[in-house]
Regions:
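Flexible, low-hydrophobicity surface segments
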Residues: 1-162, 274
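Helix-loop-helix junctions that connect adjacent transmembrane helices in secondary transporters/permeases
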Residues: 147-238, 403-481, 612, 683-704
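Thiamine diphosphate
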Residues: 232, 253-276, 280-283, 495-503
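C-terminal catalytic domains of large/alpha subunits in multi-subunit enzymes
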Residues: 67-68, 239-244, 274-279, 308, ...
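Conserved catalytic cysteine-centered active-site region
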Residues: 96-98, 241-249, 273-284, 288-291
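Catalytic phosphate/nucleotide-handling subdomain of diverse soluble enzymes
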Residues: 462-524, 539
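Glycine-rich loop/linker segments at domain edges
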Residues: 6, 12-15, 82-85, 161-208, ...
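Short acidic, glycine/serine/threonine-rich loops at helix termini
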Residues: 74-79, 120-123, 222, 231-233, ...
Length: 763
C-alpha cells in the first residue's frame, strides 16, 4: 500500500504548532454580543422571583432572559449527541424555573462586552425556594425527592426510564443460569467497585458563535463533535424547524467525548434567534469544570466464578450509574460497563448484567472516552486479577486460558461473532515488553520503596452497529486534485488525515492531492459525528466506498474519451489508458476538464455506510510502579501496551492516540476526581485543584501493535480512539496491590489511602 499504514504527518500540523488562527474564537467576527450565564448556587431549588430591572439598565446590555421567557410546559430536549430517536430522555428546557444542580442556568445575559455583562450578572436579584437535594446516588432510586417531577419529561426509547422513580434507565440481560453456575464454581470473587466522576479537561473549553444569515436562518459555528445532532438539539430547544439551523465546526481544541454533548450551543442560539444579532459564548475554565458533562460515576457489583484451574465459568454484574441532574448519555454509557467487559471471557457459560441509571442533584454527566467500558473493565479486570492471585496463577496465563478467540460468539455482545482478534498475541507481547518474568509481582528496594507490576486487558467497539452512519463526498476538480467532504469532526485526532489516506490509497494519488472539508450541516453529507470509536471504521469505510465509486466514474469517462469499453482501461492515478495499448491514454486533468467544461458527466460521488457489526479493538497493558510505603506516593515508571486495531491507517497517529489515552487512564486511577461538598457544590473548579497528569509525571510509555485484519473495515482497520484509556485502571491498581498487599476497590487511589494501608499491613 502507498498511503495506508504509512506514518504521514497530520494535514493541519504546521498550522496548529505555529499558532495560526484556526480555532473558533480566532476566526469569528469580534463584533458580536457576549453571552454569559447566571448559575444556581443551590443543588435543588425553584426560582421564586427574579428581578433583572437594574441589570438591564447597565450600558451595553442587549438582553437578559429568564425562565419567564421560556414556556415551562413546552416539549423538552436533550443535549446528548445521539442518533434519533435519542436514548437519552428529553428532560431540559433552555432555562428552567426548577434548577437541579449547583451551576444550572438561571438567566442568560447578552451585552456588547464582557465588562457590562459581568456587571449585569451581579445585579440580578434572585429569590430561591431551596429544596432538599438528592446527593447520594445509592439512595436516589425511588427516593421521595424527585429530580424531575415535571409531566413534560419524555423518554423516546424504551430504556426503562421513569422520572417518577428518579430512573434515567434500567436494563436486564443474561444467558444461562448464572446462580447455578456460580454455585458450582471452585472460586467466586465477589466485590463492589466504585469509580468516581472525572473531567475530560480538554484545553479548549466549550464555545459557540451564532449569527443570522441572509435567508433568516440561524448559523452556528461551534467546537463540537456532532454537527448534525447539535442542529437537531438546537432546533428542538428553540422549537424552530431544523431547516432553519445550520451548524459547522472549525478546528477543535480537544473533546474526548465532552463535545458529544451540546453543552454551550443552545444559549447563544437562543440569544441570536431572539435578538437577530450575532453572539458568542466561551465557557470559562470554572464553568467547564463545574457545569459540563463529566464521566458517569458508577458502582459495580461483580461476582466472578471459576474452576480451580482458572477457567472463568460465569460473570454476574450489577452497575449503578449516576447521571446527575440530566440524562445525557445515561442509558447508553451504563450498557458498555457490561457489554464491553464480559465479552472478553469467551468461555463463560453464563452471565447476567443488570443496570440502573439514577438522577441526582449533581452536575449532569455525559460522554467521556471509554464511555462506560472504562468503569466496567476496572471492575471485571480487577476481579480477574484477584482470581489469579487466589489460584496462585500468572495473570497473563489465566487470561490466555479464557480470552475470546476469533470466530467465537462473544457473551454479552448482542450475539455477535468475533470477526478479528489478536488479543492472545497482545498478551504475549506485553508480557515480554514489561519483562514480567523478572519483575512480577514485586521487588522491595529496602528503603521504604517497592517496585511492582500489574496488568489488565480491554476491548471497545468500532461504532454503534446498525445505527450510526458515516458518509463522504468526493469530487474531482478541474486540475486533477480531489475534494473530500465529510461530516465527521477532527477534534485533534487526525481523522482528516486518515480519511484522506484512505481516499488517496484507492485513487492512487499523493496525499496532498486530497483536500478535506467539513463538517457543515449545509454542505457535508450526513454523518452521525465523531464518537463511539466510529470515525475510521464507519466514515473510513464510507470514504473507501466513495473513492471506489469515483474511480469507476473516472475510468468510465476516460474510456469514453478514448473510444473504448470501460473494462478495457486501467487507471494509475495519473492517467487512464488502454490495457492493451498503454500509449493510448488521457491524463486525469484532461478527464476532469472534459467533465466540467465539456458538459459531460460530473465526476463526483457520495457514499454512506453503516455497519451491522461493531468489531472490538483489543488492548493489553502492564504497569510498573514504584510505591513509597511511607508517603503513599506512586510513580508510574513504565507502561507497556499492545493494541489490536486491525490495520493502523496511520501508525504514528494511532500511537499518539494510545499514548494520550493511557495518560488519561493513569489520571483516572491516581489523581482525578470530581468531588462535592455536603451541599452539592463542586470542589474542583480549576486545573490547579483538578489534577490531571502531564507527560513529565509519567515514565516510559511504550505502545506496540499486533494487527488482525477486519474485513468489514477500510483496508482491515478497526477503531483506536477509546480502547486505549481502559487498561491503566486495573493494571495500576493491581500493581499497587502487589507492592503493599492491599486491594483497592475505589478510584482514584490516593497517597493517603496507600500510606495508611501500608502502615496497617506492617503492624
Amino acid at each position: 500500500m502507498n498511503t495506508v499504514n504509512k506514518p504521514f504527518r497530520k494535514k493541519d500540523a504546521m498550522q496548529l504548532v505555529t499558532g495560526q488562527p484556526v480555532y473558533m474564537d480566532d476566526v469569528i467576527p469580534q463584533d458580536c454580543l457576549i453571552v454569559k450565564l447566571l448559575r444556581s448556587p443551590h443543588a435543588n431549588a425553584m426560582v421564586r422571583t427574579i428581578n433583572t430591572t437594574v441589570a438591564k439598565k447597565v450600558p451595553g446590555i442587549e438582553a437578559i432572559f429568564t425562565w419567564e421567557d421560556v414556556p415551562q410546559d413546552a416539549p423538552r430536549y436533550t443535549q446528548a449527541g445521539q442518533t434519533f430517536p435519542e436514548a437519552s430522555p428529553r428532560d431540559r428546557l433552555v432555562i428552567d424555573r426548577h434548577v437541579r444542580f449547583v451551576g444550572d442556568v438561571v438567566a442568560i445575559v447578552a451585552g456588547k462586552d464582557e465588562k457590562c455583562v459581568d456587571k449585569a450578572l451581579k445585579l440580578i436579584k434572585v429569590e430561591y425556594q431551596v429544596l432538599e437535594p438528592v446527593l447520594d446516588f445509592h439512595t436516589a432510586k425511588d427516593n421521595p425527592v424527585l429530580v424531575h417531577p415535571e409531566d413534560n419529561w419524555e423518554a423516546l426509547c424504551p430504556v426503562g426510564a421513569d422520572n417518577k422513580r428518579n430512573l434515567c434507565a434500567h436494563d436486564e440481560c443474561g444467558s444461562g443460569d448464572i446462580d447455578a453456575v456460580l454455585a458450582g464454581c471452585d472460586v467466586v470473587i465477589d466485590h463492589v467497585y466504585h469509580t468516581k466522576a472525572c473531567q475530560q479537561a480538554m484545553m479548549e473549553t466549550f464555545r459557540t458563535y451564532c449569527s443570522i444569515d441572509t435567508y433568516g436562518r440561524l448559523n452556528v459555528l461551534s467546537s463540537t463533535q456532532i454537527v448534525f445532532h447539535a442542529r437537531r438539539n438546537i432546533a428542538n430547544a428553540l422549537h424552530i424547524p431544523t431547516s432553519m439551523v445550520r451548524v459547522a465546526k472549525p478546528r477543535i481544541g480537544g473533546g474526548f467525548g465532552a463535545k458529544q454533548t451540546a453543552v454551550s450551543e443552545v444559549y447563544p442560539a437562543f440569544v441570536t434567534w431572539k435578538t437577530k444579532k450575532p453572539s458568542k459564548i466561551i465557557f470559562s475554565r470554572v464553568e467547564s469544570q463545574t457545569a459540563s458533562s463529566p464521566r458517569h460515576e458508577m458502582e459495580m457489583h461483580v461476582r466472578l466464578g471459576a474452576t480451580k484451574d482458572g477457567i472463568v465459568k460465569g460473570i454476574d454484574l450489577y452497575t449503578l450509574s449516576n447521571t446527575g441532574a440530566y440524562g445525557e448519555h445515561g442509558p447508553t454509557t451504563v450498557g458498555l460497563s457490561g457489554h464491553k467487559s464480559i465479552p472478553l471471557y469467551g468461555k463463560a457459560e453464563a452471565f447476567r448484567f443488570v443496570s440502573d441509571v439514577v438522577y441526582t442533584n449533581h452536575m449532569s454527566a455525559g460522554a467521556y472516552r471509554g464511555y462506560g467500558a472504562t468503569q466496567g473493565l476496572f471492575a471485571v479486570e480487577s476481579a480477574v486479577n484477584e482470581l489469579a492471585h487466589k489460584l496462585n496463577m500468572d495473570p497473563f496465563a489465566l487470561r490466555l486460558k479464557n480470552t475470546v478467540q476469533e470466530g467465537d460468539v462473544m457473551p454479552a455482545y448482542y450475539g455477535a461473532v468475533n470477526t478479528s482478534c489478536a488479543l492472545d498475541r497482545c498478551l504475549v507481547k506485553v508480557r515480554e515488553m514489561i519483562d514480567w518474568e523478572h519483575k512480577y509481582p514485586a521487588r522491595d528496594l529496602g528503603n521504604g520503596k517497592v517496585r511492582a507490576v500489574g496488568m489488565g486487558m480491554a476491548m471497545q467497539g468500532s461504532g454503534i452497529s446498525g445505527m450510526d452512519v458515516g458518509s463522504a463526498t468526493l469530487k474531482l476538480n478541474d486540475d486533477g486534485f480531489y475534494s473530500l467532504i465529510i461530516g465527521a469532526a477532527d477534534m485533534g485526532t487526525g481523522c482528516d488525515t486518515t480519511l484522506a489516506q484512505i481516499a488517496a490509497e484507492v485513487l492512487d494519488c499523493p496525499l496532498d492531492n486530497i483536500a478535506v472539508f467539513g463538517a457543515d450541516t449545509d454542505t457535508s453529507p450526513y454523518d452521525s459525528g465523531s464518537y463511539a470509536s466510529s470515525t475510521t471504521y464507519v466514515t473510513g469505510k464510507a470514504t473507501e466506498k466513495c473513492a471506489m465509486k469515483l474511480r469507476e466514474q473516472i475510468c468510465k469517462l476516460g474510456a469514453e474519451l478514448l473510444g473504448c469499453p470501460a473494462d478495457a482501461v486501467e487507471f494509475d492515478g495519473k492517467e487512464v489508458f488502454e490495457s492493451a495499448a498503454p500509449e493510448t491514454k488521457k491524463t486525469l486533468s484532461e478527464i476532469a476538464y472534459a467533465s466540467q467544461f465539456g458538459h459531460m458527466v460530473p465526476l463526483e460521488a457520495t457514499e454512506t455506510h453503516t455497519s451491522p457489526l461493531s468489531p472490538p479493538p483489543y488492548m493489553v497493558g502492564a504497569a510498573e510502579v514504584e510505591v513509597d510505603t511511607e508517603t503513599g506516593e506512586v510513580k508510574v515508571l513504565e507502561f507497556d501496551a499492545c493494541v489490536d486495531c486491525g490495520t493502523p491507517i496511520n501508525p504514528n497517529l494511532t500511537r499518539v492516540q494510545a499514548e494520550g489515552g493511557l495518560l488519561q487512564g493513569i489520571g483516572m486511577t491516581l489523581t482525578e476526581n470530581v468531588t462535592y461538598d455536603r451541599k452539592g457544590c463542586p470542589e474542583e473548579n480549576s486545573l490547579f485543584q483538578y489534577k490531571i497528569p502531564t507527560r513529565i509525571d509519567i515514565g516510559k510509555i511504550n505502545v506496540e501493535f499486533e494487527n488482525s485484519y477486519e474485513s468489514n473495515g477500510p483496508f482491515g482497520a478497526k477503531s483506536i480512539g477509546e480502547v486505549v484509556i481502559n487498561t491503566p485502571l486495573p493494571a495500576i491498581s493491581d500493581a499497587i496491590y502487589n507492592a503493599i498487599g492491599t486491594r483497592f476497590y475505589e478510584l482514584p487511589i490516593t497517597p493517603e489511602q496507600i500510606a495508611m494501608a501500608a502502615a496497617e499491613n506492617h503492624k
